[in-house]
Amino acid sequence: MKRALLLVPLVVAVVVGFAVVNATAKDKPKVKHGNTIHVIEHATTDTIDVDAVGHVLTFANDVFDSADHAKVGSDQGYCVRIVLHHSWECNWTTFLHDGQITVEAPFSDDGNTVGAITGGTGTYRNARGWMELKYHDPQGHEFDFVFHLHGGPGH
């Protein structure tokens, strides 16, 4: 009888642990090996007349494959000037044929940055990860977006 009473708390602990794990795992991205997508943005609409803290820059540009030959989608978003002549804080969506990827990232006037992938649609639904934003040319007319994805179907 004593042995049976000692097993009851153990069984209850296992059941509660199982329930907690299942409840917290619901709708979480399924992390697999990950996926990297590399596109090149042609920044043709990024213009601002007066540069001042708090100013908003909006954009809508085409994105090309990693060889910079074929158009594979577009992007749109906005940036707010945070530090004059130095940095912006940006939010944008990149539209590809199989879904969208949304990013929140700083943008530096004079160097590469890294941002957070905050979600997506289609194939990129539930995706998370990070994105490298690199100057493709020194003039800032083209930028490499390298998405490092995990989570979501097939990622």
What are these model-predicted stretches?
Residues 1-4:
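Positively charged n-region of N-terminal signal peptides that target proteins for export
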